[in-house]
Every structure is written in structure tokens, then in C-alpha cells.
UniProtKB/Swiss-Prot annotation:
Pathway: Antibiotic biosynthesis
Reported function: Involved in the biosynthesis of actinomycin. Activates 4-methyl-3-hydroxyanthranilic acid (4-MHA), the precursor of the chromophoric moiety of the actinomycin, as adenylate. Can also use other benzene carboxylic acids, such as 4-methyl-3-hydroxybenzoic acid (4-MHB) or 3-hydroxyanthranilic acid (3-HA), but not pyridine, quinoline, or quinoxaline carboxylic acids.
GO biological process, one term: antibiotic biosynthetic process
Protein's gene: acmA
InterPro entries membership: AMP-bd_C (IPR025110), AMP-bd_C_sf (IPR045851), AMP-binding_CS (IPR020845), AMP-dep_synth/lig_dom (IPR000873), ANL_N_sf (IPR042099)
Catalytic activity field: 3-hydroxy-4-methylanthranilate + ATP + H(+) = 3-hydroxy-4-methylanthranilyl-5'-AMP + diphosphate
Top-level taxonomy: Bacteria, Bacillati, Actinomycetota, Actinomycetes, Kitasatosporales
Pfam families per the UniProt record, alphabetical: AMP-binding (PF00501), AMP-binding_C (PF13193)
Keyword Oxidoreductase: no
GO molecular function: ATP binding; medium-chain fatty acid-CoA ligase activity; transferase activity
Family as reported in the entry's similarity comment: Belongs to the ATP-dependent AMP-binding enzyme family.
Protein name (database record): 3-hydroxy-4-methylanthranilate adenylyltransferase
Keyword line: Antibiotic biosynthesis, ATP-binding, Cytoplasm, Nucleotide-binding, Transferase
EC category name: transferase
Amino acid sequence: MADKWWGEQLLGRGDDGDLWAVSAAPVTRGELRAGVAGLRLRFRESGISEGSSVLLRMTPSFTYLQVLLALWSCGAQVVLVDFRLKPAEFEPLVERVRPQYLVVAAGAGGPVTGFRQESDFEVRRLAGGRPAEDGVVLVQFSSGSTGRPKVIGRPAGSVLAELDRHAGLPGTPGPGERVLLLNSVMHNMGLMTGVLHALAAGATLVVPPTFRPAEVLRLMARTEVSVMYGTPVHYDLLARTADRPERLSLRLAVSGGERVPEETRQRFLAAFGLPICQVYGVTEIGLIAGDLSGRCIPPEIGPPVPGVELEIDGEELLVRMDRSPYLYGEHTDRYRDGWLRTFDRVGRDPETGVLSILGRSDSLVVVGGLKVDLTEVEAALLDHPRVAEVVVTHQDAIEAFVGGDEDLTADELTAWCRERLSAVKIPKRFFVTRQLPRNSMGKLARDRALMHRHITSERSAQSRPAELKGAS
């Protein structure tokens, strides 16, 4: 690279012959650097330079990662958009950020069958696009689990500071280790915790070309994976797979994004002899807390990582930031006087400093003049042996959307809740389905209207009643 850029040390680490990543085939660090250099030249010829704004929407692949690094090396601000979004979801995002360029896969849209070694793309220049926001190199959208996604911008210093926090977390992957990544490379945990930390640490990234559990396990054995990152859904599927290799080199399994259900945690522990360790962060700043020792049990998430400054106001977690992460002057209520409101309620052990997630500050509702924590209702229902996942909402009444055994009845769920919750906390309506909808990050969707649309759609497909009336 002729010109210096903020991530040059990441890309420059290691010898050309060192293994960078493995999927269907291996890729060396020399091949990575050569690929980025060639793409950078192509982007320069297209007019992309310092201060350009580029929206990136491609098939998950090693090409995608090389494109991202090449755009950054040009000095561009990159807006990441999930390939799986439908046009009705994607087009409003383009209107909101108004990029100067699109880098998109040919025929973008539709299902993704897995991770590819290579993928084709095209570069389009858009009229009337606005240049990069001052200092911002990475733009992401919040998960949108509770409504309209937020537009979040991170400067280079924020990205590098998060990588430093990962490096300071005891037990984190180090040089020469093989790191399996099941999280999406389009989102923060997959990109930062997986791709960029492995690049910075000198570890080798392993990304399965298919997410069929038995094939993932064989890849883990063949490549001698010692660390894996995934979501609770991934861990549950792997733990249920009977066809497991006799010998695995796995020493660490890490999850983030949402709480690991106790049943999944126990099943994985029994199958692999390892606990699932938790890390916690938010898109606005990245990694905040974590424990890779396996000693913390949900709802514990571990102590704050070195380099992050926290306060707990009442029970709400606040994080110190130099600037608002929200672009275009939005969400002024979420950042004030140097502190970001996470809207997560936490407790802190006075002796160990370990944080525990208590719920969301916006999950507290008033029913009959009494405060009800909807996460407490969810926790009670999740203890039911035939319930796999739950979202509890409140508008005119408390409603529970339950994923699990479709033979569950309202009477059974109501009786279960009555043994564990006071009457005011018991849902008035239950909606039971085999599986609840999730957003593109794999998190449970928490939008009530979306849940009702899902139930209605499923009812139409199956011609069976969807609503089960519960406690009166």
C-alpha cells in the first residue's frame, strides 16, 4: 500500500506465507494483501478516495472482507448493509444515508446459502450522495429488534480501541490459534470479535462454507479449531448433533447478542465438556464486558473489559464516549454529556465487579398501577421444558409470543406462570409457534406488530388457530 491508512498495521501483520483464513480453501496473508491492493486500485479508478461514502452490500465471502479493507485503505467511509434484506428494507436505508457509491453483489437480495470463497460485485456511483461524516469510517445499523434501526457511525479510533479491548480480555485468541466464526461477518460481533481481532492477533480465521452442524464439526476437527464464536442458536444445533468427531481441539466457546438459554448451556456442556462464555457489547461502541473463564453463569456477563468507563444510573448502564455515535443529529436522548444510554439494566457485584443483565429499562411497564418487568415474565416461561424462546410485549395487555412445542396450551402456560409469578405479571394472551422470527443478526425480533404479522402468516399457512387466550 502506497499511502498510510488507519488499519495498515492490521493488514501488514505476519509473513506472506502465513495462513489468514480457511473456508472451502485456505487463503494466505500474502494473498489477502495482494487481493486488497488490486481492489484498492479498482476503487481508485472508480473515483473512490479519501472522504467518499460507500454502501457495501455483498454476499458473505472472503471477497467481501477484502473489499471492506480495500475501501478503508482508500480512505472511504463504509456503510454495511446485510445482503439478506429485501428491497423494501434495503431501499429506505439507502435513502437515509445517501451514499456516493454502492458496492453491491450482482443480483443482491434473497437467501444466502453459506459463506463463499469469492463473489462478484459491481460499483455504482449515485447522484446527490453526501460525503463521509467527519472522521467516521464504519457505519452500521442497529439490530432493529425493537423498531426502526439506528444509524451508528464509528471513527477509526473507536474501531482500534475496541480491538485493544479484545486483546486485553484474558483468554482471548492469540497468535497461531484457529478461530471458528459462525456469526455473520456483516455485523459487529462477527466483524470485530471474529474477523478483525483474528487479523490483529495473528490468529487464523475459519469460516464454514455451510452451516450444516455435522459439516461444521468435521471442519473444526480438520482445521484444529481451538476457539469458536457463535450465537445461542448455533450452540444449540451443534450440541444436538450426534455425529461428532471424537477429538476436537476446542478450548473456548463464546456467545454474544442475547442470553444463552440454560437448556442450551447445559446441553453444550454435556456434549463438549466446555461452558459457553458470554461477552457483552453494543453496536455503538463494541465490546463492554466479558468472561472467557467460564465461571460466570447467565445472567452474569463478566466484569467490564479494560479500557471502558461505565456508570450505573439507578440500574441503567451508561458508557463513556467522546462523541455521539448517532449520525444526522438523531437520538439526542440516548447520548448526553459524554455518556451513552444503553437502556440495559444491570447489577454489579461489589466484590468482583462482575456485571449481570437484569433486563431492559424499556421492559418495565405499568399494569394496574404496579411495575412489571417483562424480562421476568420471559425468564419464567423459558424455564418451561417445552419452551425454547419467548418474547413478551405490552400494549393494552401483556402478551407472550412463545416458540416451542406447538401442542402447548394457554391453560398449561397460565398454570405454569401462576406457580411462579404474581397475577399482575401473567400474560393475558399467548401466541404459540414452532419458531419466533429473528432479525438479520439472529436476535429475536421484539416488535409487537412484526410478531403479530408472523403469527397471522403462519396461521394462514397452516389453517390453524394462532391465538390462545390466557389469564383473564
